[in-house]
């Protein structure tokens, strides 16, 4: 029987799970438990959510006691300065993760809660934390450093950490494999465009820039997050609108981005609203594309020479119009999109640039769960079935 890894992604009100065979590169089952802790929900907490996940797996004919389970992999958003490799979880590590909650108050606490519950319910297998920030741990100092008082930054560990690292690393490796070229011989730009969105510049397999910063709030316009913002807006709202820090943080994370501009964060529904002539929806889309093009142009300059641009995640993989508009008029910079390829259906990695485009443009489906599962096997010493 092949070894399997259960990958868990615990959010504040949801728990996603997937049972993966990392050697074969296949998913055995996947699901999500939502509305955890909501007043009208039958799922009161993460313990009940995990029990429900086990029940859903059982309904698919999967018994975690007999399916070859060797590890549980937990996605943890923020690893701070200490955690930059997949890490075997124990009480000491969990305590350190709890200390990092100040850096990621919206993301790390539910992940730690999910870890505690899973370790209690699946006590006989290894539990491994895989960090969103790990891939960007060694960003060049010029890219990682904020231009603020150095003593303050050092004392409070303020730097650009970057997120979606598991996805950016996976996609860059898949792009190299698709092109049949060594990873350390390519300069790449990866555009991870989903409800959360980020960009990265990767030189010869090593990240040299990324759009997210101390938190996942910086960078591109997202479904509900503002992305880049003048810090003066925060103090202005505090002084003049009498908004508290928590209120401002909640607005920037949950009521901004596409939702704040157009009242809609789902791009499929946004397009329907645009077709009705809604000017707010049209503006929201234009702001999103403008910010994306700005980062793309910046990263072309950072890399100097770029070999490939890859689109991934829900919007990047499925929205041909976003890809078209993001790359429009960039022939002079070496990017020539093939419109038929861009519009055509496809499964797996595929090229959407013309054959003579100096920079290859790809669509590469991400698979963070598979990447996390493989990281778990590496932590366990490359255990195989």
Swiss-Prot record:
<protein>
    <recommendedName>
        <fullName>Acetate kinase</fullName>
        <ecNumber>2.7.2.1</ecNumber>
    </recommendedName>
</protein>
<feature type="site" description="Transition state stabilizer">
    <location>
        <position position="164"/>
    </location>
</feature>
<keyword id="KW-0067">ATP-binding</keyword>
<dbReference type="GO" id="GO:0006083">
    <property type="term" value="P:acetate metabolic process"/>
</dbReference>
<feature type="binding site">
    <location>
        <position position="368"/>
    </location>
    <ligand>
        <name>Mg(2+)</name>
    </ligand>
</feature>
<feature type="active site" description="Proton donor/acceptor">
    <location>
        <position position="132"/>
    </location>
</feature>
<keyword id="KW-0418">Kinase</keyword>
<dbReference type="GO" id="GO:0005524">
    <property type="term" value="F:ATP binding"/>
</dbReference>
<dbReference type="GO" id="GO:0008776">
    <property type="term" value="F:acetate kinase activity"/>
</dbReference>
<keyword id="KW-0963">Cytoplasm</keyword>
<dbReference type="InterPro" id="IPR000890">
    <property type="entry name" value="Aliphatic_acid_kin_short-chain"/>
</dbReference>
<comment type="pathway">
    <text>Metabolic intermediate biosynthesis; acetyl-CoA biosynthesis; acetyl-CoA from acetate: step 1/2.</text>
</comment>
<dbReference type="Pfam" id="PF00871">
    <property type="entry name" value="Acetate_kinase"/>
</dbReference>
<keyword id="KW-0460">Magnesium</keyword>
<feature type="binding site">
    <location>
        <begin position="314"/>
        <end position="318"/>
    </location>
    <ligand>
        <name>ATP</name>
    </ligand>
</feature>
<feature type="binding site">
    <location>
        <position position="9"/>
    </location>
    <ligand>
        <name>Mg(2+)</name>
    </ligand>
</feature>
<keyword id="KW-0547">Nucleotide-binding</keyword>
<dbReference type="InterPro" id="IPR043129">
    <property type="entry name" value="ATPase_NBD"/>
</dbReference>
<dbReference type="GO" id="GO:0005737">
    <property type="term" value="C:cytoplasm"/>
</dbReference>
<feature type="binding site">
    <location>
        <begin position="266"/>
        <end position="268"/>
    </location>
    <ligand>
        <name>ATP</name>
    </ligand>
</feature>
<feature type="binding site">
    <location>
        <position position="75"/>
    </location>
    <ligand>
        <name>substrate</name>
    </ligand>
</feature>
<dbReference type="GO" id="GO:0006085">
    <property type="term" value="P:acetyl-CoA biosynthetic process"/>
</dbReference>
<dbReference type="InterPro" id="IPR004372">
    <property type="entry name" value="Ac/propionate_kinase"/>
</dbReference>
<keyword id="KW-0479">Metal-binding</keyword>
<keyword id="KW-0808">Transferase</keyword>
<feature type="binding site">
    <location>
        <begin position="192"/>
        <end position="196"/>
    </location>
    <ligand>
        <name>ATP</name>
    </ligand>
</feature>
<dbReference type="InterPro" id="IPR023865">
    <property type="entry name" value="Aliphatic_acid_kinase_CS"/>
</dbReference>
<dbReference type="GO" id="GO:0000287">
    <property type="term" value="F:magnesium ion binding"/>
</dbReference>
<comment type="subunit">
    <text>Homodimer.</text>
</comment>
<comment type="function">
    <text>Catalyzes the formation of acetyl phosphate from acetate and ATP. Can also catalyze the reverse reaction.</text>
</comment>
<feature type="site" description="Transition state stabilizer">
    <location>
        <position position="225"/>
    </location>
</feature>
<comment type="similarity">
    <text>Belongs to the acetokinase family.</text>
</comment>
<feature type="binding site">
    <location>
        <position position="16"/>
    </location>
    <ligand>
        <name>ATP</name>
    </ligand>
</feature>
């Amino acid at each position: 029987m092949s070894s399997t890894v259960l990958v868990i992604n615990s959010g504040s009100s949801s728990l996603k799970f997937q049972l993966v065979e990392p050697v074969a590169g296949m998913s055995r089952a996947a699901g999500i438990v939502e509305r955890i802790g909501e007043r009208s929900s039958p799922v009161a907490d993460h313990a009940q959510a995990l029990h429900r996940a086990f029940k859903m797996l059982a309904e698919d004919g999967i018994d975690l006691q007999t399916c070859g389970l060797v590890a549980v992999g937990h996605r943890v958003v923020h690893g701070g300065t200490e955690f930059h490799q997949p890490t075997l979880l124990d009480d000491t590590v969990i305590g350190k993760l709890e200390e990092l909650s100040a850096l990621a108050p919206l993301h790390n606490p539910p992940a730690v809660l999910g870890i505690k519950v899973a370790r209690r319910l699946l006590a006989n297998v290894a539990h491994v934390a895989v960090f969103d920030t790990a891939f960007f741990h060694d960003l060049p100092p010029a890219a990682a450093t904020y231009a603020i008082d150095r003593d303050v930054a050092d004392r409070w560990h303020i730097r650009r950490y970057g997120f979606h690292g598991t996805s950016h690393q996976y996609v860059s490796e898949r792009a190299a494999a698709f092109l049949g070229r060594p990873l350390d011989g390519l300069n790449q730009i990866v555009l991870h465009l989903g409800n959360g969105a980020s960009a990265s510049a990767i030189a010869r397999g090593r990240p040299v820039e990324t759009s997210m910063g101390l938190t996942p709030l910086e960078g591109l316009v997202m479904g509900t997050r503002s992305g880049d913002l003048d810090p003066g807006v925060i103090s202005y709202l505090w002084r003049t609108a009498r908004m508290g820090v928590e209120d401002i943080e909640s607005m920037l994370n949950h009521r901004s981005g596409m939702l704040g501009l157009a009242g809609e964060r789902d791009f499929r529904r946004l397009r329907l609203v645009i077709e009705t002539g809604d000017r707010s929806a049209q503006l929201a889309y234009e702001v999103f594309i403008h910010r994306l093009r700005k980062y793309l142009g910046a990263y072309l300059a950072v890399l100097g020479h770029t070999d490939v641009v890859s689109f991934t995640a829900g919007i990047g993989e499925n929205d041909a119009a976003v890809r078209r508009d993001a790359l429009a008029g960039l022939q002079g910079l070496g990017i020539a999109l093939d419109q038929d390829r861009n519009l055509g259906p496809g499964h797996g990695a595929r090229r959407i640039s013309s054959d003579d485009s100096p920079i290859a443009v790809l669509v590469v489906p991400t698979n963070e769960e598979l990447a996390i599962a493989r990281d778990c096997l590496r932590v366990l010493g490359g255990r195989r079935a």
